[in-house]
């Protein structure tokens, strides 16, 4: 990275951390010293900092309690919408469906050539 690119990425990281309610001082701490919720939000910062067109998250709320889970999803969706990123959110937690305008239940799908549901 050039110095300018590095500065831009650092600035973008700080903006995302602020938007996701993370203190910039967390950058100085090892991830093992962060709460699970903080680790999840830092992972989202890392995923969004390069402004991807597509973000795929697999069970990002599995280790969070219901309050932290809903807060995390709201923060994630806010950032995804602001960045105009397509999000594929994978979860076994059906209660999260309320947060999304479209859901796909793969349990009800049949694989071509198969006679039984997957």
Regions found by a protein language model. Name each.
Residues 8-25:
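Conserved ABC ATPase "signature" region
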Residues 51:
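Conserved catalytic motifs of ABC-family nucleotide-binding domains
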Residues 55-58:
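Catalytic Walker B motif of ABC-type/P-loop ATPase nucleotide-binding domains
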Residues 85-90:
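Conserved H-loop
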Residues 65:
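ABC-family nucleotide-binding domains
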Residues 44:
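Hydrophobic anchor residue at the start of the ABC signature
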Residues 30-34, 38:
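Conserved ABC ATPase signature
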């Amino acid at each position: 990275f050039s110095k300018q690119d590095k500065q831009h990425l650092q600035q973008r990281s700080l903006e995302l951390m602020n938007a996701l309610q993370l203190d910039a001082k967390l950058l100085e701490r090892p991830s093992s010293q962060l709460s699970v919720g903080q680790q999840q939000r830092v992972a989202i910062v890392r995923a969004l900092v390069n402004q991807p067109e597509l973000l795929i998250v697999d069970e990002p709320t599995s280790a969070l309690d219901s309050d932290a889970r809903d807060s995390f999803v709201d923060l994630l969706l806010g950032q995804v919408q602001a960045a105009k990123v397509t999000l594929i959110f994978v979860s076994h937690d059906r209660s999260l469906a309320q947060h999304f305008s479209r859901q796909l239940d793969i349990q009800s799908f049949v694989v071509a050539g198969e006679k039984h549901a997957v």
